[in-house]
Swiss-Prot record:
Its EC number is 2.7.1.50. It catalyses: 5-(2-hydroxyethyl)-4-methylthiazole + ATP = 4-methyl-5-(2-phosphooxyethyl)-thiazole + ADP + H(+). ATP binds at K119, S165. The gene is thiM. Keywords: ATP-binding, Kinase, Magnesium, Metal-binding, Nucleotide-binding, Thiamine biosynthesis, Transferase. This is Hydroxyethylthiazole kinase. One of its GO terms (molecular function) is ATP binding. It comes from Methanocorpusculum labreanum (strain ATCC 43576 / DSM 4855 / Z).
Length: 264
């Protein structure tokens, strides 16, 4: 657990700039969570602006939750520059499988850019992996097959780290497979926890190997959720407590509470 806890320190020490082109539903939460985790956010999406911003960024997070053509144009410009600069690109394919527009957009980024991380729920990742999956809007769906095998296969195909979020988060880089069992059900009662996780994956990938970074990110947020749930009376009080718990998370707490399994 020590190597994962050290990634928390690296993020806080280096304060990486994480450029996020994300959805307007959770943009403020993603920015604040990035700060709470120890990184710095920039949320610019204009094609005229993103290229210069990427030159000083340490990671790029693309979230397709509220897509339109102008945003896609900005994402492409940012991803092209990120490719030139060699910084990690995280794709959160929100709602892939729910509509053709979302699915095709996600597949375009997967095929045209060297992604470091693809992070989504079971339905989204299953759709992109070409297995039978059900997706309801942007909510998690179901897949036919073993999530570990699906994550491993997709990661190997695209040479990246794949994260399937769920009761047990599954992470694979095509070689290793890990599971994270931290978290509480109330995390699913507020919008944006998945988007925030992608932002934090970006922060961790900026300072470490993407596989270890994603394991750290998912475990850290899960531990913080468990801590926040101890005092929360419901979703309304859980959310600020969650941000506080992320901010105050220590290495010792992480090492003690992380439930990480290495399957391969």
């Amino acid at each position: 657990m020590q190597k994962y806890a050290q990634i928390l320190d690296l993020v806080r020490e280096r304060n990486p700039l994480v450029h996020q082109i994300t959805n307007y539903v959770t943009v403020n939460d993603c920015a604040n969570m990035t700060i709470c985790f120890g990184a710095s956010p920039v949320m610019s999406h204009a094609p005229e602006d993103v290229v210069d911003m990427i030159k000083i960024a340490s990671a790029l997070v693309l979230n397709i939750g509220t897509l339109d053509e102008k945003q896609i144009e900005g994402m492409i410009a940012a991803a092209n520059e990120a490719k030139k600069c060699g910084i990690p690109i995280v794709l959160d394919p929100v709602g892939a499988g729910a509509t053709l527009y979302r699915t095709q957009t996600a597949e375009r980024f997967m095929n045209e850019f060297p992604l470091a991380v693809i992070k989504g729920n079971a339905g989204e990742i299953g759709t992109l992996a070409g297995v039978s999956a059900t997706v309801r809007g942007v909510d998690s769906g179901n897949i036919s097959g073993d999530p570990k095998e699906i994550a491993h296969s997709l990661a190997k195909e695209y040479g990246c780290t794949v994260v399937i979020s769920g009761a047990e988060d599954i992470i694979s880089d095509g070689k290793r497979i890990a599971g994270v069992l931290n978290g509480v059900p109330i995390m699913g009662k507020i919008s944006g926890t998945g988007c925030m996780a992608s932002a934090v994956c970006g922060a961790c990938a900026a300072v470490s190997d993407s596989m270890d970074g994603c394991i750290t990110a998912m475990a850290a947020l899960g531990i913080a959720g468990e801590e926040a749930a101890k005092t929360a009376k419901g979703p309304g009080s859980f959310k600020p407590a969650f941000f506080d718990a992320v901010t105050s998370l220590t290495n010792e707490q992480f090492i003690k509470s992380a439930r990480i399994s290495e399957y391969q």
